[in-house]
Amino acid sequence: MSQTLRVIVTVQGRVQGVGYRAACADMARALGLRGWVRNRRDGAVEAFLAGPEPNVLRMQAWMEEGPDLALVTQLRTTPGDIEPLPPGFEVRPTV
């Protein structure tokens, strides 16, 4: 059985206005992850991912590329332990 991994991923580049959040949420749901994704006012996209370690790592790899119109220039991952854990995967408002 895989260990549950919880991380916060911050993605910079051309990641807003290109469908990044919606595509991210679709991929996270397909991988059975819990968490959220949101735009930040500084132009980045931030996501909290929780789930089996192999699935979280696969999601992080996807986030390095993103959808076709995105251009990721930097991806930063930090441990995250956010409570309460959402029941599924949500697109949240900009912060």
From Swiss-Prot:
Chain ranges passing through the membrane: none
Record keyword Ion transport present: no
EC main group: hydrolase
EC number(s) on file: 3.6.1.7
Active-site residues per Swiss-Prot or TrEMBL entry: 21, 39
Keyword Hydrolase: yes
InterPro entries xref list: Acylphosphatase, Acylphosphatase-like_dom, Acylphosphatase-like_dom_sf, Acylphosphatase_CS
UniProt keyword list: Hydrolase
Pfam families attached to this UniProt entry: Acylphosphatase (PF00708)
Catalytic activity: an acyl phosphate + H2O = a carboxylate + phosphate + H(+)
Domain Acylphosphatase-like: from-to ranges: 6-93
PROSITE patterns to which the protein is assigned, alphabetical: ACYLPHOSPHATASE_2, ACYLPHOSPHATASE_3
GO MF annotations in UniProt: acylphosphatase activity
Family per similarity comment: Belongs to the acylphosphatase family.
Name of this chain's protein: Acylphosphatase 2
